[in-house]
Amino acid sequence: MLQLSKSPCMRTPATRSDSYELCRQITAQYAKTFYLGTQLMPLAKRQAIWAIYVWCRRTDELVDGPMASSTTLETLDHWEEQLESIFAGHPIEPVDVALVDTLGRFPLDIQPFRDMIAGQRMDLSRNRYNTFDELNLYCYRVAGTVGLMSLAVMGTAEPDLSVPWNRDQSIYYPKEEAIALGIANQLTNILRDVGEDARRGRIYLPLDDLALFNYTEADLLNGKVDERWRELMRFQIQRARKFYTLAEEGIAALHPDIRWPVWTALMLYRQILDEIERNEYDVFNQRAYVPTWKKMMCLPLAQLRARVL
């Protein structure tokens, strides 16, 4: 679906409604769990999130899609130029019309988008990470940025100024928590996709962590599941869950109409870690996923948490 044009003008005119519908279809097709969460949002916010998701997906496809072998640093530079065009109000592709409209409705900053492109540059130049600090930077760029983009759309809760003790209270903007949720999701993706990435010669788990458990790159590339691997995965899952816990702390600061979908998305994605454990950490031969019935059961619990937490 990704098309890069050197033309400064959109080749195929699209209406806003058509563009948003295209973004909806792409989100529903490629991010089923995420899409379920967006269905709980007010219309304007869900449309904006679809537009952001599609841009992020197209960006990711540059280095992780069917045409990735032809992507160069120059390709990413050109993609960033197209981003600047979109922020200037000039869409290039039909799906960009929705993003341009979103930029007019919500206070989105261009920097997280640029940071995401920087994350794709990292993917072009390396396939190993020595330390968690290195991996954490990568996770911020490719996923923590999504938290920041989404936060601008979701909005924050305003204190009830009719209550005297709230009159001096400032609005809390849960930036760190939004980043934490993006990082938690990316760490979950990495753990779920270890086998798939290994088949492409990529290892995202920090090499320092592998060494800590006496587990080698060769072991990972060969899909070796033993007690060393299980201990390593327990360590990684515990780390990811800490980021989810941090993210939870910011949900109460969000606008009330967005808390239920955010709780839903967080809880559903975190359950992937439970499924990895249920599969006895074999991410080489089994892809962890949350069954539909579990997703449905999650909805009322997420709604309850949104109301009381």
From Swiss-Prot:
Keywords: Carotenoid biosynthesis, Multifunctional enzyme, Transferase. It comes from the Bacteria. It is an enzyme of class 2 (transferase). Pathway: Carotenoid biosynthesis; phytoene biosynthesis; all-trans-phytoene from geranylgeranyl diphosphate: step 1/1. One of its GO terms (molecular function) is geranylgeranyl diphosphate synthase activity. SUPFAM superfamilies: Terpenoid synthases. It catalyses: 2 (2E,6E,10E)-geranylgeranyl diphosphate = 15-cis-phytoene + 2 diphosphate. GO terms for biological process: carotenoid biosynthetic process. InterPro entries: Isoprenoid_synthase_dom_sf, PhytoSynCyanob, Squ/phyt_synthse, Squalene/phytoene_synthase_CS, Trans_IPPS_bact-type, Trans_IPPS_HH. The keyword Methyltransferase does not apply. Its EC number is 2.5.1.32. Catalyzes the reaction from prephytoene diphosphate to phytoene. Belongs to the phytoene/squalene synthase family. This is Phytoene synthase. The lineage of its organism: Bacteria, Bacillati, Cyanobacteriota, Cyanophyceae, Oscillatoriophycideae.
